Amino acid sequence: MSNDIMGVMARMIILIGGMPTTGKTTLARELSQKLALPWLSTDQTRLVIQGVADPKQYPQLLSAHGLSAAEFFQRFSPEEIAEREYMHGIETWPGNKKLIEDDFTWREGFILEGVNILPSLLPSLQTSSDVRPLFLTDEGDDVLRKAIFSRGLYADADTYADELKEYEITWARLFDQRIQAEAQQYGYPVVRIQKDSEIDIPNVLSSLGLPV
């Protein structure tokens, strides 16, 4: 971010949520360069929590460890997986909340992105920082299908059967619908990503109330 903008703004924290494959990491990286703010992912904070977590306190976060893709999709329906993904956000929220509220390593702020950012949890934040959330969705199932079949969600796409990826399309869309509905309920912007930086970055900046 230019010095003149930073000079008049409070410490700013940008939160980017949404279902998998919407380009949250790519967007966070591009915003980081444009705004001169560091970024990190809830994937990283989740790994830290998993490394020290008690399974009794984090039942959803740890219960599927060691399962192959076939075993995982045999055990859980798409609806159950979407619910599990949502519960991961709830179980990791205390750690992410503390980071947002208490970490002043980055005094000008930072960008935090990931599926673990849930609209329903954000009102619990207590901070003087300028917190600006937004949530991403995509252009539809064709885009989602292409992304999942090319990269995979449970693991690298070439390590498990394509028929299992159909389950991933279903659960990801269910999760997306829930996040969009919650974002609208709490008044947070939802941006439909087109995977074109020249279009997406201005749309995101505008939705965040920042200069384009």
Regions found by a protein language model. Name each.
Residues D130-F175:
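A glycine- and Lys/Arg-enriched "phosphate-lid" helix/loop adjacent to the NTP-binding pocket
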Residues G51-G109:
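Conserved nucleotide-sensing/catalytic segment adjacent to the nucleotide-binding pocket
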Residues L37-A53:
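Short beta-strand-centered segment that lines the nucleotide-binding/catalytic pocket of NTP-utilizing
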Residues P20:
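The conserved Walker
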Residues L27:
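Hydrophobic positions on the alpha1 helix immediately C-terminal to the Walker A/P-loop
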Residues I16:
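Hydrophobic anchor at the beta1->P-loop junction of P-loop NTPases
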Residues G23:
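Conserved glycine(s) of the Walker
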Residues Q177-V212:
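NTP-dependent small-molecule kinase module
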